[in-house]
């Protein structure tokens, strides 16, 4: 088993990372797009909450932390572009919590911790929360089916994913532009 780390952003007190569906879709897509820059990192689980994120990552610690910082940096650019907010998304060592996962039992506990966040916050049951990886493990497959990226034109992908990054053709993309991480 690769070294694993649960990395959380600190909760924003006055602003939100995600205000609407478009923001959440952008966040999920960011997790996938930034992963292309870090081939040594694996995303095992994630939960995007309105004011913070949780990631369970595998790989060398430095790469996992760099991946997290790149995700947060891209989200900060999004908030600046969409809402005119600067400096809202703090990233870097002092603005994240890193838990070293020690063994398989601890790994399972961390996955459950991440996926229970929406329930703990009294939003909904974990299986009903669309902005986490829970559906990758425990869903009715039909709700997660998208089209292969290779079936979209480059222009359609740019519009939906808000990036010029070349997307692997096997990635699944929903009609609303949400990509699906292959976990």
Model-derived features with residue positions:
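Short Pro-Cys-Gly-centered "Cys-loop" motif that presents a nucleophilic cysteine in a tight turn
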Residues: 1-45, 49-50, 58-183
């Amino acid at each position: 088993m690769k070294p694993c780390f649960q990395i959380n952003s600190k909760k924003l007190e006055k602003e939100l990372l995600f205000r609407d569906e478009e923001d959440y879709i952008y966040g999920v897509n960011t997790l996938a797009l930034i992963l292309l820059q870090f081939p040594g990192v694996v995303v095992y689980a994630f939960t995007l909450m309105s004011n913070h994120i949780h990631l369970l990552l595998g790989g060398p610690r430095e790469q996992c932390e760099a991946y997290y910082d790149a995700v947060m940096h891209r989200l900060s650019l999004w908030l600046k572009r969409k809402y005119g907010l600067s400096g809202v998304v703090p990233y870097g060592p002092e603005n994240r919590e890193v838990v070293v996962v020690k063994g398989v039992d601890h790994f399972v506990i961390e996955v459950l911790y991440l996926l229970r966040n929406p329930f703990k916050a009294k939003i909904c049951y974990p299986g009903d929360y669309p902005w986490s990886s829970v559906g990758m493990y425990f869903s009715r497959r039909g709700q997660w089916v998208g089209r292969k990226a290779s079936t979209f034109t480059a222009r359609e992908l740019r519009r939906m994913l808000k990036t010029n990054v070349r997307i692997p053709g096997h990635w699944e993309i929903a009609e609303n532009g949400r990509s699906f991480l292959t976990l």
